[in-house]
Amino acid sequence: MKVLKFGGTSVGSVKSILSLKRIVENEAKKQSVVVVVSALGGITDKLLQTSQLALQGDEQWKVEFEAMVDRHHKMIDTIITDTTDRENLFKSVDALFEQLKSIYFGVYLIHDLSEKTQDAIVSYGERLSSKIVATLI
């Protein structure tokens, strides 16, 4: 079994994520593989920045949040060609985004961002990208 770990730049653009797919397919012909992916390039920083905006009571967090949703949706629209797979993925990703939005709203309301909450927020980057990659490959 081989573990393939891909960092943010490997899942940061359409070109790089399609390259990731080819690498995984080639390795899977030789042996079993486990794929580990980071958040889409730049998303971890965006998640943290959006956390800070919410903590400060700045409603700009909503704009930044929607920009993250749009980026993931555009990636899905571009790389997932099967209509059923794409719709199922949108449902799955949007459910995660609803959870994340609730966490941000809580941070915004109570003006508190514990380390545990921040870790939970950051985890959404990998959770979202792994769903996209799993559907792609």
Give the ranges of each region predicted by the language model:
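Nucleotide/pyrophosphate-binding catalytic subdomain
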Residues: 1-136
